Amino acid sequence: IKKEKIWDFTADLRRTAGKEVPIFTKGEKYDVLVVADEKGEFGEYLSYRTWDPRPIAGTQGLKPTSWHRTHEQWGATQMQNRFRRESGRWMTEVDYHAWTAVRSIGEAITRTNSNDISKIKEYLFGEKFGLGAYKGVKVSFRSWNGQLRQPILLAAPRSMVSVSPQEGYIHPVSELDTMGKDQPESTCKF
């Protein structure tokens, strides 16, 4: 992050975005503009209006997400189609998280041949666990905080753009640990 700026304009951007946004973004050198606008007050007006033409990411523009309806690689098309046939709608992040949770527990029960909670937990957070989850690599849980290690999709509203971790990032345990805070930096303990 090179610089953080607070959007404190009160003008109606539907009429003035073409003038306000270039001035707001002028003077800074950046590769991508990351927007945090959960309320939707200004973020929609930033695309194609910045002083320098740069990608927009965050709550508007490109979005990092665990699942997106346009994800089609590694068998995801079949997963999407099965879900859509059953539910009559596109699979969302919440649906994918629920599927991953249930599938993980089912996998742990099958592999341990046990319904003992401590054995299931030990297997889930152990080195042997890995779940094929339509992301190109098996997902797993970090033993130290319980966080799901998974590739993150970078999507535009109607298309997939990329899958992270990006090529070239290496880690001694898992490429998936290159994203977010790693064990030495984190204060989160499960």
Q: Over which residues does each language-model region extend?
A:
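Extracytosolic ligand-binding ectodomains
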Residues: 1-190
